């Protein structure tokens, strides 16, 4: 972690003594938290910069989630042509699961990035979970009671 301990700036009218600040501009988070209540003379209303995030997630969980997203994306690349070449109920249900999971994770990232506020984000994620569950249930219902996803797409292409 790069730390800047001294900074030479023009700050004040006292001449050479005021040119060199004896305080750090960027401190490690533990030092910054320790010195948070201390007032630094000559440093006008500048807050400390924290270098570590306030909420840290497990790097293993994030890595596994990222890997899972990539596996589903690559699986879809092979599953779509296979469903075209061999339309059957196994392909229909595989497509239903993979497309729903892929859409859930993608829209979940949009919710995480753009929905602000803890309560609103929880409501949006609950709504997304309900939407994904209804989507999967609807696709499974369509596969069981109608022609299935593969044959439905083929019928649309024949129009």
UniProtKB/Swiss-Prot annotation:
Topological domain spans for side Mitochondrial matrix: 37-63, 112-120
Transit peptide: 1-36
Gene3D superfamilies: Fumarate reductase/succinate dehydrogenase, transmembrane subunit
Highest taxon listed in the record's lineage: Eukaryota
InterPro entries (alphabetical): CybS, SQR/QFR_C/D
An individual GO BP term: mitochondrial electron transport, succinate to ubiquinone
The keyword Lipoprotein appears for this protein: no
UniProt keyword list: Electron transport, Heme, Iron, Membrane, Metal-binding, Mitochondrion, Mitochondrion inner membrane, Transit peptide, Transmembrane, Transmembrane helix, Transport, Tricarboxylic acid cycle
Any one Gene Ontology molecular-function term assigned to this protein's record: metal ion binding
Binding site for heme b: 102
Subcellular location: Mitochondrion inner membrane
Function in brief: Membrane-anchoring subunit of succinate dehydrogenase (SDH) that is involved in complex II of the mitochondrial electron transport chain and is responsible for transferring electrons from succinate to ubiquinone (coenzyme Q). SDH also oxidizes malate to the non-canonical enol form of oxaloacetate, enol-oxaloacetate. Enol-oxaloacetate, which is a potent inhibitor of the succinate dehydrogenase activity, is further isomerized into keto-oxaloacetate.
Subunit structure: Component of complex II composed of four subunits: the flavoprotein (FP) SDHA, iron-sulfur protein (IP) SDHB, and a cytochrome b560 composed of SDHC and SDHD.
Family (UniProt): Belongs to the CybS family.
Protein name per Swiss-Prot or TrEMBL: Succinate dehydrogenase [ubiquinone] cytochrome b small subunit, mitochondrial
The organism of origin for this protein: Sus scrofa (Pig)
């Amino acid at each position: 972690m790069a730390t800047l301990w001294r900074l030479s700036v023009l700050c004040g009218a006292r001449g050479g003594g005021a040119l060199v600040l004896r305080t750090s501009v960027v401190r490690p988070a533990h030092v910054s938290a320790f010195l948070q209540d201390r007032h630094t003379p000559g440093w006008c209303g500048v807050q400390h910069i924290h270098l570590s995030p306030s909420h840290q997630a497990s790097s293993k969980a994030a890595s596994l989630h990222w890997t899972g997203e990539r596996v589903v994306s690559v699986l879809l690349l092979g599953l779509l042509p296979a469903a075209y070449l061999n339309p059957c109920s196994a392909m229909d249900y595989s497509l239903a699961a993979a497309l729903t999971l892929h859409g859930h994770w993608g829209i979940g990232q949009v919710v995480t990035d753009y929905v602000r506020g803890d309560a609103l984000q929880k409501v949006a994620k609950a709504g997304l979970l309900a939407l994904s569950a209804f989507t999967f249930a609807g696709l499974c219902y369509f596969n069981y009671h109608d022609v299935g996803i593969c044959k439905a797409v083929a019928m649309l292409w024949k129009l």
